[in-house]
Amino acid sequence: MSRKCELTGVGVLYGNNVSHSQRKTRRRFEPNLRSVKFTSDITAGEYRLSVNARCISSVEKAGGFDAYILKADDNVLSSNARAIKKKIIQTKTAKSL
């Protein structure tokens, strides 16, 4: 399992620990990933995704999982999230016809 958010694409960053004497040692900054179950109102399904903690509040602010994933750019979404987005779009167009 990669250390990457499936909705925002945020991954591991690299930097330095810097001591008081200015010695620098390499370190990793890992995202605060959580396994969250999102419910889609359009498809009436539940989807479990690995997302960072900031993304959870972004989804709520956008008006829910469906609104967030429909606005999201396909380049940052994981392949699993792109498949969910495609399913939501297909269901939405089928309901509107």
UniProtKB/Swiss-Prot annotation:
Source organism superkingdom: Bacteria
For this entry, list what GO says about its biological process.
translation
Q: Does the keyword Ribosomal protein apply?
A: yes
In Pfam terms, one family for this protein is Ribosomal_L28
Q: Which UniProt keywords apply?
A: Ribonucleoprotein, Ribosomal protein
In the record, what terms sit under GO molecular function? Answer: structural constituent of ribosome
Gene3D superfamilies in the record: Ribosomal protein L28/L24
The UniProt entry, under InterPro entries, shows: Ribosomal_bL28 (IPR026569), Ribosomal_bL28/bL31-like_sf (IPR034704), Ribosomal_bL28_bact-type (IPR001383), Ribosomal_bL28_sf (IPR037147)
Q: Name one GO cellular component term.
A: ribonucleoprotein complex
Disulphide-bridged cysteine pairs: none
The answer to whether UniProt assigns keyword Transmembrane to this entry is no
Recorded hits in PANTHER family, A to Z, give: 39S RIBOSOMAL PROTEIN L28, MITOCHONDRIAL (PTHR13528), LARGE RIBOSOMAL SUBUNIT PROTEIN BL28M (PTHR13528:SF2)
Q: Which family does it belong to?
A: Belongs to the bacterial ribosomal protein bL28 family.
Protein name, entry field: Large ribosomal subunit protein bL28
Which organism encodes this protein?
A: Rickettsia massiliae (strain Mtu5)
